[in-house]
């Protein structure tokens, strides 16, 4: 059985939870205290972060890698496009999400930044600006790629879910 080591408040962990639930997989979630991680987390992931997926070998970490593995191993419903060119485009969007949105999410989630209101407001502003640029896509389509739920929706959903929390 797959085991997902996951933080209850970690948006990257929530991405993996979405994919596992969307696929209807039988899996176990082991919640990890993000501020007091057990030693075995660093053994499984040299960066000491969650999510981590354990299912035989290899042990996987980093949400986009875990999610692509699950999508390829269990292809229904398909979350990545079948066409290689479209798949490459989705991967570029995922990279853009990381660099243009989730960099700022990391600031908002950081304990160290909690006392730096200027850094928090800058992160909020950057997220707000980028989401405003993306707004036409949300108005036009049911999901980011159109009619079908995809890996792009999985990647963005944890951020959208937390907007009120982030302020």
Label every model-predicted segment.
Residues 1-144:
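GST-like domain detector, emphasizing the conserved glutathione-binding G-site
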Residues 144-167:
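GST superfamily/GST-like fold recognition
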């Amino acid at each position: 059985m797959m085991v997902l080591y996951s933080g209850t408040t970690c948006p990257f962990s929530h991405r993996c939870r979405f994919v596992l639930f969307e696929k209807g997989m039988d899996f176990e979630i082991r919640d990890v205290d993000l501020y007091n991680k057990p030693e075995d987390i660093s053994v499984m992931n040299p960066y000491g972060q969650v999510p981590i997926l354990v299912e035989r070998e290899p042990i996987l970490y980093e949400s986009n890698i875990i999610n692509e593995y699950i999508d390829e191993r269990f292809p229904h419903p398909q979350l990545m496009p079948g066409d290689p060119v479209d798949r490459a485009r989705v991967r570029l969007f995922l990279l853009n999400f990381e660099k243009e949105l989730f960099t700022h999410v990391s600031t908002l989630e950081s304990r160290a930044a909690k006392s730096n209101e200027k850094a928090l407001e800058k992160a909020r502003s950057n997220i707000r600006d980028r989401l405003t640029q993306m707004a036409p896509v949300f108005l036009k389509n049911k999901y980011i790629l159109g009619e079908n739920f995809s890996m792009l929706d999985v990647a963005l959903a944890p951020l959208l879910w937390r907007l009120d929390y982030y302020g």
